Amino acid sequence: MILKPKIALYEPDIPQNTAAIIRTCSCLDVMIEIIEPCGFMINDKRFKRVVMDYLDEKMIKFYKNYDDFFKIKKKEKERIILMTTKASTPYSSFNFKITDTILFGRESFGVPEKIHKLVDNRLKIPLSFKKRSLNLASSVAITLAESLRQNKLI
C-alpha cells in the first residue's frame, strides 16, 4: 500500500457520517482511525445502510481513548492536524505531508480544549459569514482531497 495521510475521528456521534467517511476513505485507499467511545454501535442499522460493503477492517483502526491515540502517534512521529472552526489557518494554505493524521472532532462538540493543546497544527475550512460549520463527512472529503492533491496522490 502507498503511504498516504490518515483520517482520525474523535468520538464520532452520528453513524451515517462515520459510514460516509469510511466509504470516502475506502474509495481513496486511506486509513481511518476512530477514537472511542462512539455515540453508536458498528452494528447500528443506520451505519450499515450507508457503509454498505465499503467496510474493510484492514483500513480501520480503533483506539480505546485519546491517550492511546496520542501515545502511538508520538511514537510513530506522525503529525496530528486538527480540523476545527476555532483555527485561523485555512487548510488550503497548509503544506500537508503523507505521514500526517488529520483529526476531526465530534459532530456535537468538536474536541475538548486539552486536545487542541496536544495537536501539531490546527486548520479550518473557511466558511461564508455567519455559518457555523460543514457536515463532518463533507469536511473530511474536502480536507482529504486537498491533502492527497498536494502530495500528488490523486
Mark where each language-model region is.
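RNA substrate-binding interface of SAM-dependent RNA methyltransferases
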Residues: 1-85, 148-149
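Hydrophobic/aromatic ligand-binding patch that stacks against planar heteroaromatic rings
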Residues: 24, 114-115
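Short, hinge-like loop/turn segments at secondary-structure boundaries
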Residues: 49-55, 98-100, 142
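Short glycine-rich anion-binding loops that position phosphate/pyrophosphate groups of nucleotides
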Residues: 85-89, 106-109, 129
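Active-site oxyanion/phosphate-handling segment shared across diverse enzymes
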Residues: 91-99
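Ser/Thr/Gly-rich flexible loops in soluble cytosolic domains mediating phosphotransfer, phosphorylation
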Residues: 106-114, 133-136
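Structured adenosyl-cofactor binding patch, chiefly the S-adenosyl-L-methionine
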Residues: 118-154
